[in-house]
Every structure is written in structure tokens, then in C-alpha cells.
Amino acid sequence: MAKVWSKRFDNALDTFIEKFNASIFFDRKLILEDLDCSIAHAKMLGKTEVLSSTEALQIINGLESIKVDYLEGKFSPGPPSEDIHYCIEEKLISLIGETGKKLHTGRSRNDQVGTDLRLWLRKEIDNNEILITDLQKSFLNLAKSNIYTLIPGYTHMQRAQPLSLAHHLLAYIEMLQRDRERFKEVRLRVNTSPLGAAALAGTKIKIDRHFTAAELGFEKIYKNSIDAVSDRDFCIEFVSASALLMSHLSKISEEIILWVTDEFSFAKLTDKCATGSSLMPQKKNPDVPELIRGKTGRVYGHLQALLTMVKGVPLSYNKDFQEDKEPIFDTAETISSCIKAMTILINQGIEFNVKNLSDSVENDFSNATDLADYLVGKDVPFRTAYQVVGEIVKYCLERKILFKNLKINEFKKFHPKFDEDVFLDLKPFNVVKSRNSEGGTGFVQVEKEVNNWQKKLLL
């Protein structure tokens, strides 16, 4: 099939180069956005009388017909069309004849594809907002039933201090909230229309850029036609926000993987979210969180690919930009599937072993800070109290015992201000209960935050 630009050339394009150059294999994903973009453009050309009302209506009806055929499975874009834009234009011309050739008046594929991609990304961002909110709700429901469940808190993967399990789960909700906010900020910049910038310099054709922007739901237009077609920073921002989201999902996944090991035994996976081994019949594998953790790398890779793609590219549009779509499409699909999988996992796939969690905080030194705080409450300087407790920890380790195994006279050997009430302060439940600074793990604070999140998430 002859290219629309072929009259400039004496010889046909090499068949391999033709395939190498084509983007129809992946940019056909933009078909609905391209149709909407073209319909808005045709309406504008009719409004500005570049086209007669009859011509504009004929083009619009033709495009609507193509949309219906596509949605009903009667039209499938593909080769030999070079890209989705030519594919639709060729289909339109075959439907309505010569009038279809007037559709591209006053625009270029450069501003057209930029518009399509922004429309597509806007839809994906709106979908992510729903998916991330659903995941937050899943964590909140789990937190509500585990306010008084204790779990060891870690720093450097070493036991640090006991926590409310709900407090731990609420931390994920906070991270996901920042992810939502990042996507909203990306949407603000995505929601700017480049349509009408044409190839790079604008057009002498009488157009109304504000009309097409409004038709397509954009809040504003690009003020510089070169800038409108020259950058893919909005794509990079989307993948960057996605990479940060995946880092959080990967963090959550890693913890779940650890929790369900025999060594931790803090939780178990239900049959709905676990798989077995082809060789070892005893196995129950955490494939879902492992896959999410593994897929994080591909999103990171897409971010690096896009950053490299735009590095050193001069103004304005360059063919390099064709390489933006596959990373964008795969990133969007990856994060969507990972959020959905994590939501199912949290809703149906994990059961906490409350007894093991309770036993774990009863048999360690994670209450050491509270022992120091006890002395601080007796007017002992913190640094002195810290050193005293360090000596007590060493004493216990040498004898393979815990604080709770000491007698009061043993405590008093280290400092005279220890009294019988120290044993109450050392109970893990009381340790957690006492941490009532704002944002802390104390039960009052956790209940407060659960209630706050119920209001925010409309639960």
C-alpha cells in the first residue's frame, strides 16, 4: 500500500525497514483515543468553517461508524497500515471517499499522537485512583480487626520494638496515599492539549485549539507549539510515579513473603493465593507477592528506557519518541495487575497467626527502650538509663534469660530506682499501649487513625 508521503520518493521503502519503522503493532492500543481526537478535530474544522457543515458531519459519522465497528469486533487495526493514525484515515476514506482526505487539515501526526497518548494516560491514571483506593480499603479492613494484635517491629531486620499490627498496616495506607497524590499531580500535567501545534510551528489554517481542548476534556492548551510536540516528560512522570508505587508494593510483598515462612510463621497464605511445587508435595509458595516483587524491576527498566530516550534529543519531534509507547503501555498494565493481585491477596489471601505474633514479642528484648524510659520516668537522665539497660541486656544474654525472668533485686543491682512496677512497664501490651505520641503505635492513636482513614476512604 502506498504511503501518504510516498510521492516525495522515487523508490519504495525496503520491506524490512517498513516493518522496522511501523508502530501499528502497538499504537493500535490508542484507537479509541485517536478516534475521539479526530472527531473533536473534525467538529472544530466545521465550527471554524474550514470544512462545510456537510463535510464535517460526514467525517464525524464515518469516524463514529469506525468506532462502532471496532467495539463490535468488525474492524481490527493492523498492517499494512504504518500506524493507527493512517489506519483510521485509510478506513475513513474507504467509507466516505474524498471527503475523508480533509480530516488531517491543520494538524500533524506529531500533535495527534501527543493528544492520543495524553487521553490514554489520563484514563489510566483515573483507573489507578480507583484501584489504589480499593487496596487502601483492603488494608484498612485488615487493620480494623488487628488494632490489639501485636507484631515485632524491625529496624535493620533486627527486632526493635513491639507494634500494633494495625499500625504496621496503616503505614502501607499512608504510602499508597502518597502514590495516589503523585498520580493526581501527574494528571494535572497530562491534562494539557497539544492538538493544534501541528508538526512544530502551528498552522496557518483557521483552527480553535480551545474548542478541541474542551471537547476532549483538557483543562488547558500548550502555549508553545514546539514544546507541545518535543517532550515526553509527562510519560516519564507517569512511569516514575508507577515505579514508586511498585517499590511500595514490592516492600509489602517482601514482608508477606517473610511472614509466611516457617522461620517467621507470623501468617499463612490461603489456598486462593498460593501455589504448590511440581516436585515437593509439602510446599505452599507465595507466588503472588514474589511476582509483584519481580515485576517491580520491569517498571524500573521502563523508567530508565524513557529517560534515556529523551536524553540529548534536540527540538522538536524525533522518531525516538515512537519508543515511548511500549514502556508506557506495559507499565500501565503491570501496575494495574499488581494492584489488583495485591488487593485480592490482602482481602482473601493472608491469615495472621495471632498466637505466634504474641509469643514473638514476649520472648525478645524489644521492650529494652521501655526499660530505659522507665528510669527516665524516675528522673534518671536518658543516656544514663540507656547505658544501664545495655548492661542489663548483656547480663541477660550471658545467662540466656529475658527481662521478665529477672528478680527485682537483680534490677536494683544495676540501678536503685528500679521497683516492682517495672514488670508492668515491660509487658508488651503495655509497651505498645504507652506509645501515645501523635502518629505512634499506642492503641488510642491507632484507633484514631483507623477512624480518620474510614472517613477519608468513605468506609
UniProtKB/Swiss-Prot annotation:
User: What is an annotated GO biological process for this record, any one?
Assistant: L-arginine biosynthetic process
Q: What sort of enzyme, by top EC class, is this?
A: lyase
| Keyword Lyase listed | yes
Keyword Coiled coil annotated = no
Which Gene Ontology terms of cellular component type are present? cytosol
According to the UniProt entry, what is the EC number of this protein? 4.3.2.1
Which reactions fall under this protein's catalytic activity?
Answer: 2-(N(omega)-L-arginino)succinate = fumarate + L-arginine
- SUPFAM superfamilies the UniProt entry points to: L-aspartase-like
Q: Name one GO molecular function term.
A: argininosuccinate lyase activity
- Places the protein is found: Cytoplasm
- List the Pfam families hit by this protein, alphabetically: ASL_C2, Lyase_1
| InterPro entries linked to this entry | Arg_succ_lyase_C (IPR029419), Argininosuccinate_lyase (IPR009049), Fumarase/histidase_N (IPR024083), Fumarate_lyase_CS (IPR020557), Fumarate_lyase_fam (IPR000362), Fumarate_lyase_N (IPR022761), L-Aspartase-like (IPR008948)
Q: Which domain of life is it from?
A: Bacteria
Q: Which UniProt keywords apply?
A: Amino-acid biosynthesis, Arginine biosynthesis, Cytoplasm, Lyase
Q: Which pathway does the database say it acts in?
A: Amino-acid biosynthesis; L-arginine biosynthesis; L-arginine from L-ornithine and carbamoyl phosphate: step 3/3
Q: Do you know which Gene3D superfamilies this protein is assigned to?
A: Fumarase/aspartase (C-terminal domain), Fumarase/aspartase (Central domain), Fumarase/aspartase (N-terminal domain)
Q: Which NCBIfam families match?
A: argH (TIGR00838)
Q: Which HAMAP family match?
A: Arg_succ_lyase
Q: Specify the protein name.
A: Argininosuccinate lyase
**Protein species of origin:** Prochlorococcus marinus (strain AS9601)
Q: What is the lineage of its organism?
A: Bacteria, Bacillati, Cyanobacteriota, Cyanophyceae, Synechococcales
| Gene name as annotated | argH
